[in-house]
Amino acid sequence: MNSPVLTDDGRARARDLGLVPGRLPTGPANAISDVPGVRVGHATVIAGADIRTGVTAIVHDDLLSGAAALPAGLSVFNGFGKMVGSTQLAQLGTLETPVLLTATLSVFRVADALLSCLHERHWGNPQEGHEPGTLNPVVAETNDGYLSDIWARPITTEHVRMALDAAADGPVGEGCVGAGTGTSALGFKAGIGTASRIVGWATGPVTLGALVQANFGGELTVLGTPVPAAEALAAAGITDEAEQGSGGSSGGGAPRLSGGSCVIVLATDAAVGSGRLERVASRAFAGMARTGSDFSGRSGDYALAFSTAAGRATAGPDERVPDSDLDLLFKAAIEATEEAVLNSLFMATTTRGFRDHIRHAVPLDYVRARLRASRG
C-alpha cells in the first residue's frame, strides 16, 4: 500500500517564511489557543487506502464543563453546507457546546457523539444532577471526498472523545490533522490553520484567534501575489495530469480550482455580545478573499465568532464598546483569518488517498521565489 503522506519535510508556517499578513501583533503561539481558556484537539483518522479524515474540537472551559453558554455570532457567506446547530446559534446568539469540525457526511454522527460525550462527562451520574432539557451541539464540515471516502462515514464516538480529550492550549497542530486530514484548497493540499492577533482597546489589550478548515477553490494569492497551482506544480516537476488523480483536474494537468468550502472559527476575550460577534465573523471572509477564494456557488463558507467573556457580555447588543475598538477587532479577524488559511496550506503535506487521488502540497520554495520576483 502507498503511504498516504508523500512528503513531510520542509513545511513551515507563513511567518517562518518571512510572510507577515497585516500589521497587528500576534499572541504567543499565534493560534486560536492564545485566547485564555480556548484549547484545540484533533483526532486524525487514516485507514487503508481510502480514509483520510478526522475531527477537530475547539473547546473552552465553560463549554466543556457545561457551566455556561457563551455569546456567539454566525455569518454565512454561502450556505452550501451542513452546519448542525447553526439556526439556534444564530437565533439565540449563544454557544452551548465545543465547536467540532469534520467531514461532510460525518457531521451528523459527530453531533450525536458530542452529545453522548458531554452527557457521560456531566450527567451520567444521577448524583451529579439532572441533564438539561436540551443542548445545541455545533458541528461544521467541509467535503474531503476527493481524498477520503465520505460515504464510509468512519468517525465514531471514540474519535470525538479523543479530540475532546486531546484539547490543549499552546501551539496547535496544523495542516493534515483532524478535520483537515483530507481537505484541499486553491489547487493544493490544505487542512487546519490558525493564527491570532492582539489589539489595544481603551480598556486594555484583547486577543482574537482564528482557526480554519480550508477546503475551497480559487487561485492562491500570498500577500497580494498570485501563485497559480498549475505553474507552481510544474516548477516543482509535477506536470502529468495522472499524478493529480482522476477527477482532480480541469484539463491540461491543472488541478481543479473551483468549488469547496471553508469553516472559520473565531474566538476572543473581548467583552462583546452576539450582534457584534456576528459582525466580527463576517469580516473573516475578507481575510479568506485575500488568499484567493473564488466563493463559488457550491462552496459552504461559514464563520462563527464567540466571546469567552462570560458574565461581561450578553447575547444582546453591547453598547459599551466604542466603534473605534470594534474596528480594531474587525481588522484582527481579517488578518488572523488570512494568516490561518496560509498556514493551513503551508503546513499541509502531499497526500494520496481515495481512488489513488493525490493532492500536492504548495511548493514553498516556489512561493518565496514568486514573491521575490513580484517585489522586484
Regions found by a protein language model. Name each.
Residues 1-376:
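Alpha/propeptide regions of enzymes that mature by internal proteolysis
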